[in-house]
Swiss-Prot record:
InterPro entries: PPP1R15 (IPR051254), Prot_Pase1_reg-su15A/B_C (IPR019523)
Region Important for host CHOP inhibition: start-end pairs: 16-18, 57-61
Any one biological process term the GO annotation gives: regulation of primary metabolic process
Subunit-structure text: Interacts (via C-terminus) with host PPP1CB.
Name of the protein this chain belongs to: Protein DP71L
Function: Interacts with the host phosphatase PP1 catalytic subunit (PPP1CB) and recruits it to dephosphorylate EIF2S1/eIF2alpha and therefore restores the host translation that has been shut-down by the host. Also inhibits the EIF2S1/eIF2alpha-ATF4-DDIT3/CHOP pathway.
Keyword Nucleotide-binding found: no
One Gene Ontology molecular-function label: protein serine/threonine phosphatase inhibitor activity
Annotated consequence of substituting L61A: 43% loss of host CHOP inhibition
Signal peptide residues on this chain, from the entry's feature table: none
Annotated consequence of substituting L57A: 69% loss of host CHOP inhibition
Family statement drawn from the similarity comment of this UniProt entry: Belongs to the asfivirus DP71L family.
Length: 71
């Protein structure tokens, strides 16, 4: 091992090159949700909808039930 070091050639340096056509991805274009996530979202949305309708209808239905019981 003679202790000689190679001199680095100037044309061995790496250069950065960029593609002429850039491909842009929007967040909406990337499908990240699996089918099970969509089912879970639908189930949660449906539960909220049922709760809101129940709140509206319960007063009317309870009032009608009380009227029928009084007769």
């Amino acid at each position: 091992m003679g202790g000689r070091r190679r001199k680095k050639r100037t044309n061995d340096t790496k250069h950065v090159r960029f593609a002429a056509a850039v491909e842009v991805w929007e967040a909406d274009d990337i499908e990240r949700k699996g089918p099970w996530e969509q089912v879970a979202v639908d189930r949660f949305r449906f539960q909220r909808r049922i709760a809101s309708v129940e709140e509206l209808l319960s007063t009317v239905l309870l009032r009608q039930k009380k009227l029928l019981e009084q007769q």
